[in-house]
Amino acid sequence: MQHTTFHAFCIAAPRSGEGKTTASIALMRALARRGLRVQGFKCGPDYIDPTFHAQATGRPACNLDTWMMGRDGVRALWDSRAHDADAAVCEGVMGLFDSRDPGDPAGGTADCARALGLPIVLVFNGRGMAGSVAALVAGFQLHAVRMGVRLVGAIANNVGSPRHADILRETLERSNLPPLLGALPRREEWRLPERQLGLLPSEEAGTTAAWLDALAEMAEQHLDIDRLLALTTSKRPEAPAPLLSENVPPPAHGHRQRQGLCFYYEENERVLRSQGMGTRSRFPPLADYGPGRHSA
């Protein structure tokens, strides 16, 4: 059953490593457990985070990249994947205003959010911070206006105590800045496993439904999800026209998928299916098995 309201927002951060992936997964899972159909998105060419989004929501996630796809391409993909959802959550990449070129915002989180008109929730590491949170949020709010995007709230990560959270919240209130929508306490068990070049893929990380549910419960306890939803109500995207496909027998296709060879774009699969490609199967390329029964 489709809810009458639609919510959409972007989770961003001042830089990588602030906790935006954990916050994104926790919110996606919490919203899904509330009975909403949640669609996850990831800014940029990241193969790993969407696998966690898919586990949290039960729906395939997809990438949005204004550098590779252009703004019109991003909007079209957003419409095609979000039109039948109740909430769409887009996780940013790196810092909110980072991009491949300091003079060109293409490919960055802010550019993607601007193309889609998404309000932004800033996740930041609150460890060792008190009154300085006002300068941090004020700076991001000011530059957001310059970049044509809107900051509607913040979430503190690695908060030491309820009193610490209160200090951060009161500071933003007194400074007339976007509100603190929650404060996540320090918990080692909530950390996603990492390696040199980023997070481990979900298959290697061994994430379970119980772990995802624990994140959702953490979000319900420490985040003001109702207020977040009230701040991010949006117009539901319209369903796009289907892609042209030929009325021909669909050929089977396969792709390699195993540890170390599991990176692919979900959107590529959708386009193949829309063009008449039939059954997809995954095969382990390192085993004694080949794609001989496939057309492609």
What are these regions (language model features)?
Residues T4-H7, E246-A252:
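A short, charged/proline- and glycine-enriched loop
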